[in-house]
A protein has these predicted regions:
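Short coil/loop residues immediately preceding or within conserved phosphate-binding loops
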Residues: 61, 68-71
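Active-site HxH/HxHxD metal-binding segment of metal-dependent hydrolases
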Residues: 1-64
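Accessory terminal helices/loops
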Residues: 126-130, 139-212
Length: 212
């Protein structure tokens, strides 16, 4: 598991029961595997995924072998604190979990950290990457170029927000100026994903759910 969210650990128990194989995750994610109700699910999450069955995880080390592939484990916080990526240096593959998700950036979860995601992506961009394997976009060729494109867009957005903040505009006015009205994701998720979360995380330099 790249991280502890319900849509990533949901099949663990069935896989273990069917194949009897270990499930690996970062050490901090293991309590969520053993007790999935530690995940505070919103209504939309309960409708789509609900809480998974309990499963037993094993702490992943600095590398892992899978067939003829040798993956290096990279700590990749931002989407969650326990997020990891897997890098295969010979094939130049990067498995990004929920960290990459395409070159555009509009909506942020309330428990994500925009600036931390940006710094992690910049770290990953130092790798030689031929193909990104993304949870949302599938196989993305020219992976390093895709990362650099996303980084550039995120830096431009960050700079615009900070510039307007320094001119005295409040977060909601900045969101309206740069991104316009909220979209369907804000309504469907009850604000869990929103444009405002993106602006707030840049404006205050932290996760929106930690802003007083």
């Amino acid at each position: 598991n790249t991280h502890h969210h319900e849509d990533h650990i949901g099949n663990n128990r069935d896989i273990q029961d069917l194949f009897g194989i270990p499930i690996y995750a970062q050490l901090a994610a293991l309590p969520y595997l053993e007790n999935p109700r530690l995940n505070d699910l919103r209504l939309y999450q309960r409708i789509v995924w609900d809480w998974p069955k309990k499963s037993k995880g094993t702490a992943i080390g600095e590398s892992i072998d899978a067939g003829n592939c040798h993956f290096k484990i990279i700590q990749a916080p931002g989407h969650t604190e326990d997020h990891i990526c897997l890098y295969e240096p010979d094939k130049k593959w990067l498995f990004t979990g929920d960290l990459f998700c395409g070159t555009n950036f509009i909506y942020l979860r309330r428990d994500e950290n925009y600036l931390q995601i940006l710094e992690t992506l910049k770290t990953l961009s130092q790798l030689e990457i031929k193909t990104i394997f993304c949870n949302l976009k599938g196989a993305v060729e020219n992976g390093r170029e895709a990362l650099l494109k996303k980084i550039s867009k995120m830096e431009q957005l960050r700079d615009r927000v900070i510039n307007l903040r320094d001119k005295g505009l409040p977060p909601k006015s900045i969101r309206q100026e740069i991104m316009g009205d909220e979209g369907a994701w804000n309504l469907i998720t009850g604000g869990h994903y929103s444009k405002q979360n993106t602006i707030d995380s840049i404006f205050f330099g932290m996760r929106p759910d930690r802003i007083n």
